[in-house]
Amino acid sequence: DDRIVSGYTYDGVVIPQIMYLDGNRSAAIRDDGFTLYKGSQIPKEVETIKVDKEIVSTFYDDNIIGLVFKNGDKDKPYTMRGYSTDGSLKFEKKFNIPYTTIKASGGNILLYNSSQISVMNSRGVEKYSGTVDGTISDFIKTGWNRYLLVLDNGVDVIKLS
């Protein structure tokens, strides 16, 4: 029983993550960028974005694919690039947030570590940054400017104005 509908060979490339953006589009995160595919029955490669820096983090949702690199800058050691799901660059931003987790959630980019959170919009503009009492386990957007902050000692709902 062969259930393979499509296959591609990429010599010298590692693809650690594949995600479905919707029923018709998917993306493969590569060690040198990402490749976009279209088609629900037989996915076809439509766009490949290559980068010449080492990718340290990735994030995505239905509308954005993000890559983070180290850039060697002492003041702002990370560069974030956000791409639309058609492969066009939406923004590039240098930042210095000491994050351990980055993800896209509800049209925002959420960065956090055990005690700090940062919320950016889909263009990389910071909407909020702060510290919390307790150890952060998870941070999720739940509604219009509402976020769920899961801590080791409980759960908080945060509303940004």
What are these regions (language model features)?
Residues 1-11, 30-50, 75-95, 115-132, ...:
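Surface-exposed loop/turn elements that mediate protein-protein interactions on large endomembrane-trafficking
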Residues 7-24, 50-63, 94-107, 134-146:
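Repeated scaffold domains used in trafficking and secretory/extracellular systems
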Residues 17-30, 34-36, 60-75, 101-119, ...:
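Short beta-strand elements that form the blades of beta-propeller/WD-repeat-like
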